[in-house]
């Protein structure tokens, strides 16, 4: 069991149960999955770009991503149907907690001019999204070996019913929120 998973079971559950008045332990919100998505529009012109994106996402997540393809052709963007356009990976369980630990403790503090993450990126149902502009904030990516700076979207899905519950959960995991 990872460090954050033990911390969640021992401390966070009791704190959230007391704060929100849950009667049952199963009512306490938890993180169900983390989805990492990297859209690579340059893959239309050069097919090798998608391979670099897949290798970067594999290093970051520790799991092989799925290559996402276009659903329909759009002539204005010069895209045909079933063109590889990005990659995504869904983390659950042990790998999810290990990634969350690395994100909070190592990656986010390495962002240039970092003042905390926005508290307004919740979707209304207790899920949180973070946009990362450069993949080099993760220590697994070596700056000398990348071909281009690419951003990625990190979606944290929780069982929380409201944004306040989700924010309390993520704050307990020491997410550095701005105000």
UniProtKB/Swiss-Prot annotation:
Gene Ontology BP annotations: translation
- GO cellular component terms? ribonucleoprotein complex; ribosome
Protein name (record): Large ribosomal subunit protein uL5
Subunit structure of this entry?
Part of the 50S ribosomal subunit; part of the 5S rRNA/L5/L18/L25 subcomplex. Contacts the 5S rRNA and the P site tRNA. Forms a bridge to the 30S subunit in the 70S ribosome.
Q: Where are the transmembrane segments?
A: none
One family name in Pfam for this protein: Ribosomal_L5
Q: Which InterPro entries match?
A: Ribosomal_uL5, Ribosomal_uL5_bac-type, Ribosomal_uL5_C, Ribosomal_uL5_CS, Ribosomal_uL5_dom_sf, Ribosomal_uL5_N
Spell out the molecular function terms from Gene Ontology: rRNA binding; structural constituent of ribosome; tRNA binding
Write out the similarity annotation: Belongs to the universal ribosomal protein uL5 family.
Q: What does this protein do?
A: This is one of the proteins that bind and probably mediate the attachment of the 5S RNA into the large ribosomal subunit, where it forms part of the central protuberance. In the 70S ribosome it contacts protein S13 of the 30S subunit (bridge B1b), connecting the 2 subunits; this bridge is implicated in subunit movement. Contacts the P site tRNA; the 5S rRNA and some of its associated proteins might help stabilize positioning of ribosome-bound tRNAs.
Recite the UniProt keywords alphabetically: Ribonucleoprotein, Ribosomal protein, RNA-binding, rRNA-binding, tRNA-binding
Q: Which gene underlies this protein?
A: rplE
């Amino acid at each position: 069991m990872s460090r954050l998973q033990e911390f969640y079971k021992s401390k966070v559950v009791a704190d959230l149960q007391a704060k929100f008045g849950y009667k049952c332990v199963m009512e306490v919100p938890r993180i169900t999955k983390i989805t990492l998505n990297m859209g690579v529009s340059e893959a239309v012109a050069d097919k090798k770009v998608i391979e670099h994106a897949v290798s970067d996402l594999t290093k970051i997540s520790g799991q092989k991503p799925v290559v996402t393809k276009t659903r329909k052709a759009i002539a204005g963007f010069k895209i045909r149907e079933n063109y590889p356009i990005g990659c995504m990976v869904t983390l659950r369980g042990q790998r999810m907690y290990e990634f969350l630990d690395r994100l909070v403790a190592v990656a986010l503090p390495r962002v240039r001019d970092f003042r905390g993450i926005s508290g307004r990126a919740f979707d209304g149902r207790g899920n949180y999204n973070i946009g990362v502009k450069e993949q080099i904030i993760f220590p697994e990516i070596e700056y000398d070996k990348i071909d281009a700076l690419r951003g990625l979207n990190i979606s944290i899905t929780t069982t929380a019913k409201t944004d306040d519950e989700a924010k309390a959960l993520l704050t307990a995991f020491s997410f550095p929120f701005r105000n």
